[in-house]
Swiss-Prot record:
GO terms for cellular component: mitochondrial inner membrane; mitochondrion; respiratory chain complex I. This is NADH dehydrogenase [ubiquinone] 1 alpha subcomplex subunit 1. The gene is NDUFA1. Complex I is composed of 45 different subunits. Belongs to the complex I NDUFA1 subunit family. Its main location: mitochondrion. It is found in: Mitochondrion inner membrane. The keyword Disulfide bond does not apply. It comes from the Eukaryota. Accessory subunit of the mitochondrial membrane respiratory chain NADH dehydrogenase (Complex I), that is believed not to be involved in catalysis. Complex I functions in the transfer of electrons from NADH to the respiratory chain. The immediate electron acceptor for the enzyme is believed to be ubiquinone. Disulfide bonds: none annotated. It comes from Bos taurus (Bovine). The keyword Lipid biosynthesis does not apply. It is a single-pass membrane protein.
């Protein structure tokens, strides 16, 4: 019957889901608790470069709040 396909679909769905979640967890672990930022457009790249300059440690994922900027 049609429901015999459901376990195979579930296994396939889990196998497609795991790499995306693992990638997000690895990026969060390696970037100090933040997810990796992606710059698809020049404006996003500009914001990442600004964050890198403002951080003081030359890393875009180390953020400083407005109260900590000299």
């Amino acid at each position: 019957m049609w429901f015999e396909v459901l376990p195979g679909i579930a296994v396939m769905g889990v196998c497609l889901f795991i790499p995306g979640m693992a990638t997000a967890r690895i990026h969060r672990f390696s970037n100090g608790g933040k997810e990796k930022r992606v710059a698809h457009y020049p404006y996003q790249w500009y914001l990442m470069e600004r964050d890198r300059r403002v951080s003081g440690v030359n890393r875009s994922y180390v953020s400083k709040g407005l109260e900590n900027i000299d």
